A protein has these predicted regions:
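Intracellular loop-helix junctions on the cytosolic face of multi-pass helical membrane proteins
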Residues: 1-64, 146, 152-163, 171, ...
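Transmembrane alpha-helices of Major Facilitator/SLC transporters
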Residues: 112-120, 311-336, 345-357, 421-424
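A membrane-interface helix-boundary motif in multi-pass transporters
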Residues: 130-135, 218-229, 337-340, 430-457
Length: 519
């Protein structure tokens, strides 16, 4: 909203009638002045993201912002993207595994993510020396660093050993993710209007980290680089601000019982299990055929024979497109209701999947579009749509979390999403195996992709499971939302910056801060 409009809506009073009676010429001058302000200088446009970050830091603790940057930017963004490219070539060129088998192995990467409720439960009710968040950042960093150094220095090892090390890397990322997500969920409940902004910050950090990771993966194939983000997680565990908990050992059992009882009661609500079921099915039914496609477009005798450097560049451009998707959501879509937004996002998601069929059948060459241009265009479109589809589901998840067990319950919802991703990988692996897609035979790959696209369109029929509410609405009853707030909430995790205003004053303050947001 324009700052002038905000002031009119917030500060308008009956005494403003004199302002409404201004002569036409003065109104024209005021309109011209506002139009001049609207035509912002390049410097002001450049400063908008920094002003947005300043606004978030003023409402949230700055070390929380730093934690989001480290976890989402480095641990998930950089490490996840670099990991994806390097391990794909590792399984293909070093271990020489069939694509359907790689799909099953990649599905095992999601085991630490499926265990997120356990990590969330630990962070909520089992503080270490009085701290609920710091120790788990340290554990995540040490686990990820040791696993990365092992797989990087041991060379070619048995598949079981390599798989264990790679799962260890993803476990470090998952533990760090659930720890920072607990803070995000808590802040999203306490300052509802900032929930979309926090998810936009996560998305931008993740995309920027992915851009760096994909760009470097084509030229630096060493797995040693995967030890860098966990090392910074260790640093984060020492510097992040957290109030020390005063919970006694005898109270931990009570908190655990409250958490389990609260989770059981909340997940049974139709307002919760219906959108959770939709999120699972929307991921599981979109079966993954990535490994079959990867083997095809890097195989010289069948596909376009892309090099590792070009594959990294494709994903890097896709990371830029992901940032564009975040900006599109932040500027135009964050105020739309959940159901209508996810309906159109899923429809576009199915339509973009048909680009893979066109590429595999080489119809792009028939119409004169080179492979390298078409694949980059397809990557950009699919990344933008995927990001627009994904962010509302994360915001929806934060709106379903009750206070006091927000870390545990958000982890449970993310566990459901991880189960959906695991089902997608394994389902895709089974389809690739049934259609006899191997390292050298890709005859039926297009049929597997076509089935995937059909399932994406079929998911639209489940959209009734998504609530119609806006992205700032309370989706669960107030008694459930605050039922667990006595579970050591007074010393829970990362603190918000102290805000003493009443609810009305806080609303006016946020209205004024809207002028600093990315628009």
């Amino acid at each position: 909203m324009d700052p002038l409009e905000t002031q009119e809506l917030v500060g308008k009073s009956p005494t403003d009638s004199s302002k409404q009676a201004l002569p036409i010429s003065e109104q024209d001058q005021g309109r011209q002045s506002s139009e001049t302000c609207a035509r912002a200088s390049p410097l002001s446009i450049f400063m908008e993201p920094f002003q947005w970050l300043q606004m978030l830091s003023s409402q949230l603790n700055p070390t929380f912002i730093f934690g989001v940057v480290v976890v989402y930017g480095l641990s998930q963004g950089f490490s996840g993207s670099f990991f994806k490219v390097v391990t794909d070539f590792y399984w293909k060129d070093v271990q020489k595994v069939q694509p359907s088998a790689v799909q099953l192995y990649i599905g095992l990467y999601y085991i630490p993510w499926v265990m997120k409720p356990i990590w969330g439960l630990l962070t909520d009710v089992f503080p270490v020396r009085g701290y609920k968040r710091r120790p788990y950042f340290l554990v995540a960093g040490v686990l990820g660093c040791v696993s990365a150094l092992m797989v990087a220095t041991l060379g070619k090892v048995p598949i079981a050993v390599a798989l264990s090390c790679l799962i260890g890397i993803t476990a470090g990322v998952a533990i760090a993710d659930v720890t920072i997500d607990a803070c995000i969920a808590k802040n999203s409940i306490e300052i509802r209007s900032l929930a979309p902004d926090m998810q936009s910050l996560c998305g931008i950090c993740s995309s920027l980290g992915a851009l760096i990771g994909y760009s470097s993966s084509g030229f630096f194939a060493s797995l040693v680089l995967l030890a860098v983000p966990p090392t910074i997680l260790i640093v984060l565990g020492f510097v992040i601000y957290e109030v020390r908990s005063t919970t006694l050992q005898s109270e931990k059992k009570k908190d655990l019982q409250i958490a389990l009882r609260g989770m059981s009661k909340t997940i049974k609500l139709p307002q919760v299990w219906k959108p959770s079921l939709y999120m699972y099915l929307s991921l599981a039914l979109s079966i993954s055929t990535h490994e079959g496609q990867f083997y095809w477009y890097t195989y010289p005798k069948a596909g376009p024979a892309f090099s590792q450097e070009f594959v990294g560049m494709i994903y890097a451009v896709g990371a830029l497109a992901s940032i564009a998707g975040v900006l599109i959501y932040q500027k135009t879509l964050k105020d739309y209701p959940f159901r209508s937004l996810l309906l159109y996002a899923q429809l576009l998601y199915g339509m973009t999947g048909m680009l893979d069929v066109i590429f595999f059948l080489r119809w792009n060459l028939v119409i004169g579009i080179p492979d390298y241009f078409f694949v980059i265009m397809e990557e950009c479109v699919s990344r933008i749509i995927s990001r627009i589809r994904w962010i509302p589901m994360i915001v929806l998840s934060t709106r379903l979390c009750p206070l006091g067990i927000e870390g545990t319950f958000f982890a449970l919802l993310m566990c459901i999403d991880s189960l959906g991703s695991l089902s997608s990988k394994w389902g895709g692996g089974i389809v690739l195996h049934l259609f006899h897609v191997t390292r050298t035979d890709f005859t039926n790959l297009w049929l597997a992709i076509l089935i995937r696209n059909f399932l994406r369109f079929a998911t639209i029929g489940l959209i009734f499971l998504v609530p119609k509410g806006d992205q700032e609405d309370d989706l669960i009853p107030p008694d459930i939302l605050t039922a667990n707030s006595d579970a050591s909430l007074d010393d829970d995790g990362l603190e918000l910056a102290p805000v003493k205003e009443t609810s009305e004053e806080a609303r006016l303050l946020l209205d004024e801060e809207n002028s600093l947001k990315l628009k």
